Amino acid sequence: AARVKPKLDEIKAKAEEAQQQARLQALWAYGNEPVKGGAQISAAIYSQEPVDTDGGGSHPVRLIFRDHPDWGRSSYLVLEAGDFDCYGGCRLKVIADGKTHTLPGSRPKTDDAIAMFVEDHKRLWKLAKESKQLSIEFPTKAVGKKTAEFEVGGLEPDKLPKWN
């Protein structure tokens, strides 16, 4: 039994690691929709915990990476309630595995969705690809600065080939 235990522990650890990686991969949703001029492909993930973005209760925040034939590549956050306070542009504090970065953000003047672009989409993609944990602090109109945390370790970069 003493001889078998180390090998058994190693097998258990590998199984737990594989299970954790599968859980992290399942957090991401990938889209591939036909649009005029080609296909829009995307990778999206919800925040680990809901965030109160309007003073009326907590809701998930979504981080999306999109590749569109007409609009190109973009990364943005989407709220279910409240609004971003970033119409003239803003600076976002992004923490990737404990290391702080500052990226530019902007809120488009549209009512289609409550979205805010992370303007340096290439850098955010690189951080998401290389990190396990990503948090983004963003300004809201109603309740000031809020932070959404994402478990990004399961991102499958090959699903958005033009981003790599």
Regions found by a protein language model. Give the residues of each.
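A generic "folded-domain core" signal
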Residues: A2-N164
